[in-house]
């Protein structure tokens, strides 16, 4: 079941990739993918290229894929290990969701962080208290790690 579903998603992704994103298997292992997200234009991540890993569980799509950033990023919902705090990757997962939709959700998280459910409270505090400083640091990290 999982393998057929993953193959279908790969075909769909290659045919109609989501804006600013790409993804595909690492070598021959269809359960392990690498994804790329271009920093959205209306964000401090503009111009950056961010790499992520996607690991599919054997019971996919009934369980969500494990998605993590391998590129360092300054963001309240993404920690230094690359873990992403995003409801659809946890409690709000549904088998109707796809890798494409997950990548688009991560893109919109880059544009609109959720400081009220942070993985990195210090960054969330900066985001809420001093948006200019947050944007400056996010831009600096993008230039340092994603360009």
From Swiss-Prot:
List the PROSITE patterns. UBC_1, UBC_2
A Gene Ontology BP annotation from the UniProt entry: protein K27-linked ubiquitination
EC class of the enzyme, as a word = transferase
Q: Report which reactions are catalysed by this protein.
A: S-ubiquitinyl-[E1 ubiquitin-activating enzyme]-L-cysteine + [E2 ubiquitin-conjugating enzyme]-L-cysteine = [E1 ubiquitin-activating enzyme]-L-cysteine + S-ubiquitinyl-[E2 ubiquitin-conjugating enzyme]-L-cysteine
Q: State which pathway it belongs to.
A: Protein modification; protein ubiquitination
Superkingdom field: Eukaryota
Q: What stretch or stretches form a coiled coil here? A: none
Query: What InterPro entries does the entry give?
Result: UBQ-conjugat_E2_core, UBQ-conjugating_AS, UBQ-conjugating_enzyme/RWD
Please name the SUPFAM superfamilies in this protein's record. Answer: UBC-like
Q: What is its EC number?
A: 2.3.2.23
Q: Which residues form the UBC core domain?
A: 1-147
Question: Which residues participate directly in catalysis?
Answer: 85 (glycyl thioester intermediate)
Instruction: Name the Gene3D superfamilies on file.
Output: Ubiquitin Conjugating Enzyme
Give the keywords, sorted: ATP-binding, Nucleotide-binding, Transferase, Ubl conjugation pathway
GO cellular component, as recorded: nucleus
Molecular function via GO: ATP binding; ubiquitin conjugating enzyme activity; ubiquitin-protein transferase activity
Q: What does this protein do?
A: Accepts ubiquitin from the E1 complex and catalyzes its covalent attachment to other proteins. In vitro able to promote polyubiquitination using all 7 ubiquitin Lys residues, but may prefer 'Lys-11' and 'Lys-48'-linked polyubiquitination.
Similarity annotation: Belongs to the ubiquitin-conjugating enzyme family.
What is the protein's given name? Ubiquitin-conjugating enzyme E2 D4
Native organism = Homo sapiens (Human)
User: Top-down, what is the taxonomic lineage of the species of origin?
Assistant: Eukaryota, Metazoa, Chordata, Craniata, Vertebrata
Gene symbol of the encoding locus:
UBE2D4
């Amino acid at each position: 079941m999982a393998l057929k579903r993953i193959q279908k998603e790969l075909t769909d992704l290659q045919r109609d990739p989501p804006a600013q994103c790409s993804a595909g298997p690492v070598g021959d292992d269809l359960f392990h993918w690498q994804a790329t997200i271009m920093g959205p234009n209306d964000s401090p991540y503009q111009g950056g290229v961010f790499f992520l890993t996607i690991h599919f569980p054997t019971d996919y799509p009934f369980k969500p894929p494990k998605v993590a950033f391998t590129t360092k990023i300054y963001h309240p919902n993404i920690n230094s290990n690359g873990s992403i705090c995003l409801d659809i990757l946890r409690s709000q997962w549904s088998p109707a969701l796809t890798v494409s939709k997950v990548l688009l959700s991560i893109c919109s998280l880059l544009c609109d962080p959720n400081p009220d459910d942070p993985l990195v409270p210090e960054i969330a505090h900066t985001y809420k208290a001093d948006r200019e400083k947050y944007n400056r640091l996010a831009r600096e990290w993008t230039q340092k790690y994603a360009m």
